[in-house]
From Swiss-Prot:
GO MF terms held by the record: phosphatase activity; polynucleotide 5'-phosphatase activity; protein tyrosine phosphatase activity; RNA binding
Similarity annotation: Belongs to the protein-tyrosine phosphatase family. Non-receptor class dual specificity subfamily.
Species annotation: Homo sapiens (Human)
Chain segments annotated as coiled-coil in the UniProt record: none
Keywords: Hydrolase, Nucleus, Protein phosphatase, RNA-binding
Function, in words: Possesses RNA 5'-triphosphatase and diphosphatase activities, but displays a poor protein-tyrosine phosphatase activity. In addition, has phosphatase activity with ATP, ADP and O-methylfluorescein phosphate (in vitro). Binds to RNA. May participate in nuclear mRNA metabolism.
Subcellular location: Nucleus; Nucleus speckle
Primary subcellular site in the record, as a coarse category: nucleus
Active site: 152 (phosphocysteine intermediate), 158 (proton donor/acceptor)
Protein name as annotated: RNA/RNP complex-1-interacting phosphatase
């Protein structure tokens, strides 16, 4: 089940996805488990329009948080502005509506709710909805550089999976590169092994949905096969990489977006990328990352190798050979 919210105007106003009958409802204003352990907002993923963040919490949660722990919808926009970026769409993947209301967001920013069950790999319908929303946004925002903000509860597992799934399926990015780019920009590694394994070894998901009539209010899905190059406007032309007019849509689609591939690899190989934003790289397996101290807090039962690399130092950090975080499990 998905819900669009845009009270005035915008490219997403008329869309309404159908699916699950209702979201899972939970009472109370208890803080989500482990929510405090994660950075509020990551960095923009270079070569893309994506930025990931944990769910902001409405004002009623603040009495249970220290002032420095609060992260409200207003705080979200302030932190995005501090990075000299602007949000143009928020995609909410949480499976509840208790954390904040669309009305808490600026009226000028479209909001899309895609109810996504946690812990399990999203189904093909959810993946397609996400791809359709992203491509619709890119199509309508070719002439600006606004970002797509994506969040689940922690802005990590469901968020990372769907962003990486898009990069792999639509942009043709290698799974390892997509996962590493997300990990570095989010400041935390994807944790769920089933998500990582599906991204690494699972099938490419089709970029169209045969169950949705082409004449429906879902609009013409053919533009999913024509991903808009999402490079910043002033950095060169956009390329319409796959013309399909007059042809049937292929079952699977890869785009070899060379500039995006180069951006991913260049970013991943830059050992100083975190110094600009004061974020350490994601933690190696078997270690408990504490972003407040910019160091690795080694678990008592960690391996000898983990104990040997106890702290992170920004000036001698060398890129970990991927996969650095594959053995993290819940």
């Amino acid at each position: 089940m998905s819900q669009w919210h845009h009270p005035r105007s915008g490219w997403g106003r008329r869309r309404d996805f159908s699916g699950r009958s209702s979201a899972k409802k939970k009472g109370g204003n208890h803080i989500p488990e482990r929510w405090k352990d994660y950075l509020p907002v990551g960095q923009r993923m270079p070569g893309t329009r994506f930025i990931a963040f944990k769910v902001p919490l409405q004002k009623s949660f603040e009495k249970k948080l220290a002032p420095e722990e609060c992260f409200s919808p207003l705080d979200l926009f302030n932190k995005i502005r501090e990075q000299n970026e602007e949000l143009g769409l928020i995609i909410d993947l949480t499976y509840t509506q208790r954390y904040y209301k669309p009305e808490d967001l600026p009226e000028t920013v479209p909001y899309l709710k895609i109810f996504t069950v946690g812990h399990q790999v999203p189904d093909d319908e959810t993946i397609f909805k996400f791809k359709h929303a992203v491509n619709g946004f890119l199509k309508e925002n070719k002439d600006n550089d606004k970002l797509i903000g994506v969040h689940c509860t922690h802005g990590l597992n469901r968020t990372g999976y769907l962003i990486c799934r898009y990069l792999i399926d639509v942009e043709g990015v290698r799974p390892d590169d997509a996962i590493e780019l997300f990990n570095r920009c989010r400041g935390h590694c994807l944790e769920r092994q089933n998500y990582i394994e599906d991204l690494q070894n699972g099938p490419i998901r089709k970029n169209w949905n045969s169950s949705v009539p082409r004449s429906s209010d879902f609009e013409d899905s053919a533009h999913l096969m024509q991903p808009v190059h999402n490079k910043p406007v002033k950095q060169g032309p956009r390329y319409n990489l796959h013309q399909i007019q007059g042809h049937s849509a292929p079952r699977h689609f890869h785009t070899q977006t060379q500039s995006l591939q180069q951006s991913v690899r260049k970013f991943s190989e830059n050992p100083h990328v975190y110094q600009r934003h004061h974020l350490p790289p994601p933690g190696p397996p078997g270690e408990d990352y504490s972003h407040r101290r910019y160091s690795w807090n080694v678990k008592p039962n960690a391996s000898r190798a983990a104990q040997d690399r106890r702290r992170w130092y920004p000036y001698n950090y060398s890129r970990l050979s991927y996969p650095a975080c594959w053995e993290w499990t819940q």
